[in-house]
Amino acid sequence: MSKINHISYWLFLVLPSALFFEKIVASTLIAVLFLIKIPIIFQFKTLKLLIKQKILLFSILYFLLHAIALLFTIDIEDGLYSLEIILSFLVLPLIGITFKRNNKPLQINRHFVEKLFYVFVSVGFLAIALCLCNAFYKVNFGNGSKDYWFFYRGLAHPLWQIHPIYLAYYLNFLLSILLFHDWNLKWKFREYIKWILILLTIIFLILLSARTPLVVSFIILILFIYHRLKVHKVALALTTLSLLITSVLALVFTNNRFKELFNENGILQEDRVQTWRGAYEVASDHFWFGIPKGDLDDELEKVYRKNNHTKGLERSYNCHNQYLQLLCYFGIFGLLYFILWLYYVYRATIDNHLIFQLLVFSILIYFCTESIMSVNKGIVFISYFFTLIAIYEK
């Protein structure tokens, strides 16, 4: 049993780093962990511990609500597929609670988290190096366009065509680790190396040009200036304002991803606003109890067609807002349940770890512009860290 506990400990530790690779890698790790932990998961002592963990119960309930919604959906096939996608919200809490029964050296504590940070940062920079090397090769030896390979989808392409938004989310977390974690390293040039890596991460995030993660990066940097450098509040306010104005002007006038937000008259024309309007229209029509996932896509398609939202129709856009997505799925009661879940997660981070607190804060912002909990790369990321926060031993 001791050997199995060691194996599961390390598999659980490397799981978030597997998100930089093809999604089958993380899915395989979760499946192996579940098979290893089955004998422990369904023991009475484990289930008794689970009942005391509100965050884990909320996660499992999220899966069960989708399962119950299958009874009311017209499109069973799509509903079953969505249930398969969110399986991590059921499986990872069941895996996670078993670590509560481990001996102290194999529990989820600060030693575990420190190892996780080392692995995540190392794999993250391997991913950055791979993307930059691929871009350099394509531009200089493959007759590729610099505007494509050093930018957005082209830059993220070698990581099994991961969507740049999700890569940027992971790098936001990596940036938080670099800035706020106290590294126990005795390297001679430790601080120089650290700041070179921070600068490289910021440059890479700018090249990726994922807008919401750039906003989050800016907030993380401001919080670092305030918390770690102990800057006077007036100086901080002036610095923040200066950086904000400079950043906005630089990005809007030099980056196509930001230029396309406005038309020639300077009026906002972002298609995401049209998507939100359509999603809100669907949510308003099913305000109290929502509409099952299997039927939501059809309803959104009808609204997009009615509102002439061509891009949303062609690309089958979801709500692009997790709060709206939940309102559409389960109505106002489902949204209130979701907010309560997030409250418990955030409250747990206040007492245990600043970096986790930043992570949850970042996720709350991501939810405003993406339906992260509808995509595998986002589902595993969120279900893993919500579980980790719940089982973390101070």
Positions of the model-derived regions?
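Transmembrane signal-anchor hairpin modules in multi-pass inner-membrane enzymes, especially those
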Residues: 1-77, 98-114, 118, 183-192, ...
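Juxtamembrane membrane-water interface segments that cap and precede transmembrane helices
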Residues: 8-12, 146-160, 309-323
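Membrane-embedded alpha-helical segments of multi-pass membrane proteins
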Residues: 21-43, 83-94, 166-175, 214-222, ...
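Transmembrane alpha-helices of multi-pass inner-membrane enzymes
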Residues: 32-37, 356-368, 372-394
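A membrane-periplasm/extracellular boundary helix in multi-pass inner-membrane enzymes
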Residues: 64, 129, 228-268, 277-285, ...
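Alpha-helical transmembrane segments of multi-pass inner-membrane proteins
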Residues: 111-145, 150, 159-228
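Long extracytoplasmic/lumenal interhelical loops at the membrane interface
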Residues: 263-277, 281, 285, 289-330
